[in-house]
Amino acid sequence: MQTQTPCSDYVETKGLIYFARMLDKIRLKAAGKLPPGYFTGVEDPTHFDARCTRFLGLNYDELVDRTLKGGSDEEILEWCFARGRRPSEEEISIWNAFLRKRGWRDEASEELAESKKEAGFGNRDDIQTWLDLHDAEEGRTPRPFSYG
């Protein structure tokens, strides 16, 4: 079966980045199309799936069940808001900023540097965050930093 990479972390669902990617990974994994090496679930609390479900006050397994029942990303996010919590606009802005910068001058920097080298991108100065690395690994050009 042919594999497919998930959408970029930057895809927004009701202003929230990463959520669409998490749902994409859930759907691709269930269909047997998620390439090997992608992290899904909440076993490691530092991975983005775990952080996102905690941010929304959700149980990951319940989110998987709901996602596989079908519906748009927006419909599933509304279900999340009703089931867990609805972050304020300010909280979403803080979440988005955290993810956009993760790996840049923080406790995840060392692991990011190691992962860059393993992926063959050790010499790439344009890869400064985990989102940059995901984009590069999936054939997208990392985005220049912006404050928005």
Predicted ranges, named:
Residues 1-8, 45-46, 77, 81, ...:
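Generic, low-specificity signal for short hydrophobic/alpha-helical stretches with a mild N-terminal bias
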Residues 2-41, 98-148:
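Polar/charged low-complexity regulatory segments
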Residues 16-19, 60, 73-74, 92, ...:
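Alpha-helix initiation and N-capping motif
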Residues 35-81:
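Amphipathic alpha-helical packing elements
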Residues 63-120:
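Amphipathic protein-protein interaction modules
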